[in-house]
Amino acid sequence: MDKKKLIKYGLVGGILGAAGSIVILLLCFMYSKVIVADTDYTLTMGMKLLGNISESEMQEQLGFVVAKILAACKKKEITKLALISSDMRNISENMQEDLVKKLKKQDIQLDVLAEIVTDSEAMSKLFAEGAAVMIEKKGVSLYQRVYDMVDLCVENEVSILGVIDTRK
């Protein structure tokens, strides 16, 4: 074989290999069972993203998120709402407590409700309050569980003000 054919086949093989790798990565991303990007909330589920909170910079980011929650509550005249998650064990207790305290200072009562899909008492509290903020952890929260919560809220006319995305 001459040198030109080796270069030609090498380039074509390299390009096809790279394209195949990209396709495989895209398919893995598209068919992932966990939430991996902010657009999963906004585009796929049609929910407003209230903000991203990382545990390392929690205080600065929490102020921004609380301001957005307050604006939504004021707009809809809400004084009591629930904090819901597909798995509240993934959300740090410090973050939950700080959200409750900051909103309480602004005369908004935030009740942390765990497992609303399976716990009937938490479910009835959610229905009584009529409004909720969802908090999920990117890379951990499962699509199906989040969809189940959203469906439950929509069916029972519970307004979801938005979602808070958390990460390490």
Question: What do the PLM-derived regions correspond to, one by one?
Answer:
Residues 1-14, 18, 44, 58-168:
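P-loop NTP-binding module
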Residues 22-54:
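Flexible, low-complexity linker/tail segments at the boundary of structured domains
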